[in-house]
């Protein structure tokens, strides 16, 4: 679990997301409160429930990007889902309980990787011994079994030294590795994924853990043996317990496009299996219930839920009242301005302009963006957003791709040249498209 302070979290998010300080502060405080809660005594800890967040803002302003970056910072089980993928219980489609099952699977994977990393040193020692056993087989007793507790021979020690120094990396050896589990592809109707997973697990267990001889270079064999030995050192039962504990205490669920499951005012009544029904199914998860997964029972009382939506044709008040009450923290994200677009093009780590420079650099073409050129690109993107559909920062991808089309096409033939993208270059390539609303609607 991350121990970063709210200021550190916001600073890290600033490296990738421009503006939207209110949203960054809200998620930073929520993430820090997870850590604060774990410092309380057990009785009080149980009473402190997470304050779920609803992020409201037009498309392309950074809602999903905040979720992506938060997942990397959280160091906790995290899953992002689209609200539109689910249907009410009893109808064809995914049920909302699958959110918690997927979150638990993510936690199992995360805890397994942590456990493997923790055991890596021991796994490397065991892998080294297995390779040395192939290079210099240990002495055997009268029954043909390897003798235990024998002193390492001088030859074995010499080979160990060579192995550690990489002198034997290219030597080929034959080793026994665990065969890949038997893969059984089962096609199941939507909503039956849990049954499919259980059947696949059953077939894999029936296959048993078979050893398969393989001829590999020592360098490759060592990597595979380390993974195999590290996996053996992981206790499956402990793994499940730790993963379920991590989900219950630190899990974070990000629900995108929640506005798409609102019942908009004035709509006719009747069955609405992918809207209000989904909201009612989400309620127990958000307020706290117990979900059955293949790894065990998971309580959702202390899982943090962050929902987001553009709310262009609906409003947060169109959510059912019970769900509104379970999302107490509201954060509005602002539409992006020309100045924001300018900053997006230059300030974030691996900004769009840096990406294009690096891509063209692989062909030996040197690209330079001037400040005036970047300003004109930002103005063009903002203008198209205003005159057609506002898709936020995603418009920059379209505009830049159009601007760089000729250079990208000719790059292999203009090796060694330098190209400066200034205001005149941008005007020559974009102004006609931007000015013609019909063209910009279809091309930009």
Swiss-Prot record:
Entry keyword annotation includes Nucleotide-binding: yes
Domain of life, source organism: Bacteria
Subunit structure as annotated in this protein's UniProt entry: A double ring-shaped homohexamer of HslV is capped on each side by a ring-shaped HslU homohexamer. The assembly of the HslU/HslV complex is dependent on binding of ATP.
InterPro entries noted in UniProt: AAA+_ATPase (IPR003593), ATP-dep_Clp_protease_ClpX (IPR050052), ATPase_AAA_core (IPR003959), Clp_ATPase_C (IPR019489), HslU (IPR004491), P-loop_NTPase (IPR027417)
Protein name: ATP-dependent protease ATPase subunit HslU
Family recorded in the similarity comment: Belongs to the ClpX chaperone family. HslU subfamily.
GO cellular component: HslUV protease complex
Described purpose of this protein according to its UniProt entry: ATPase subunit of a proteasome-like degradation complex; this subunit has chaperone activity. The binding of ATP and its subsequent hydrolysis by HslU are essential for unfolding of protein substrates subsequently hydrolyzed by HslV. HslU recognizes the N-terminal part of its protein substrates and unfolds these before they are guided to HslV for hydrolysis.
First and last residue of the signal peptide: none
Main location class: cytoplasm
Pfam families noted in UniProt: AAA (PF00004), AAA_2 (PF07724)
């Amino acid at each position: 679990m991350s121990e970063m302070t709210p200021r550190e979290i916001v600073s890290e998010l600033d490296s990738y997301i421009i503006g939207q300080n209110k949203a960054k502060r809200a998620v930073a405080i929520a993430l820090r409160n997870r850590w604060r809660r774990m410092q309380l005594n057990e009785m009080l800890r149980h009473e402190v429930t997470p304050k779920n967040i609803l992020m409201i803002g037009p498309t392309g302003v950074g809602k999903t990007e905040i979720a992506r970056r938060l997942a990397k910072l959280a160091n906790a089980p995290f899953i992002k889902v689209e609200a539109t993928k689910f249907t009410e219980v009893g109808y064809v489609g995914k049920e909302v309980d699958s959110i918690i099952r997927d979150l638990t699977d993510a936690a199992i994977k995360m805890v397994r990787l942590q456990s493997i990393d923790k055991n890596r040193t021991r796994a490397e020692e065991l892998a080294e011994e297995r390779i040395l056993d192939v290079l210099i087989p240990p002495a055997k007793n009268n029954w043909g079994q390897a003798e235990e507790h024998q002193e390492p021979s001088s030859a074995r020690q010499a080979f160990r030294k060579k192995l550690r120094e990489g002198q034997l990396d290219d030597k080929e050896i034959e080793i026994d590795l665990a065969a890949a589990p038997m893969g059984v592809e089962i096609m199941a109707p939507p909503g039956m994924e849990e049954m499919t997973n259980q059947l696949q697990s059953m077939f894999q267990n029936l296959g048993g853990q078979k050893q398969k001889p393989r001829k590999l270079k020592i360098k490759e064999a060592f990597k595979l043996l380390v993974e195999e030995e590290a996996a053996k050192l992981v206790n499956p039962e402990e793994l499940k317990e730790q993963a379920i504990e991590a989900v219950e205490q630190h899990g974070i669920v990000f629900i995108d496009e929640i506005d798409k499951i609102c019942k908009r005012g004035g709509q006719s009544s009747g069955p609405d299996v992918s809207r209000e029904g989904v909201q009612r199914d989400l309620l127990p998860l958000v307020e706290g219930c117990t979900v059955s997964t293949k790894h065990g029972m998971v309580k959702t009382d202390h899982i943090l839920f962050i929902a987001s939506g553009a709310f262009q044709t609906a409003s947060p008040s169109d959510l059912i009242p019970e769900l509104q009450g379970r999302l107490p923290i509201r954060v509005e994200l602002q539409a992006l301005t020309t100045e924001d677009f300018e900053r997006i093009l230059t300030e974030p780590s691996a900004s769009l302009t840096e990406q294009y420079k690096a891509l063209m650099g692989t062909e030996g073409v040197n690209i330079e963006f001037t400040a005036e050129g970047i300003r004109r690109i930002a103005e063009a993107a903002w203008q198209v957003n205003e005159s057609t559909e506002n898709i936020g920062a995603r418009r920059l991808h379209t505009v830049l791709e159009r601007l760089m089309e000729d250079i990208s096409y000719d790059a292999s033939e203009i090796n060694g040249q330098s190209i400066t993208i200034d205001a005149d270059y941008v005007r020559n390539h974009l102004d006609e498209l931007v000015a013609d609303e019909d063209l910009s609607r279809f091309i930009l």
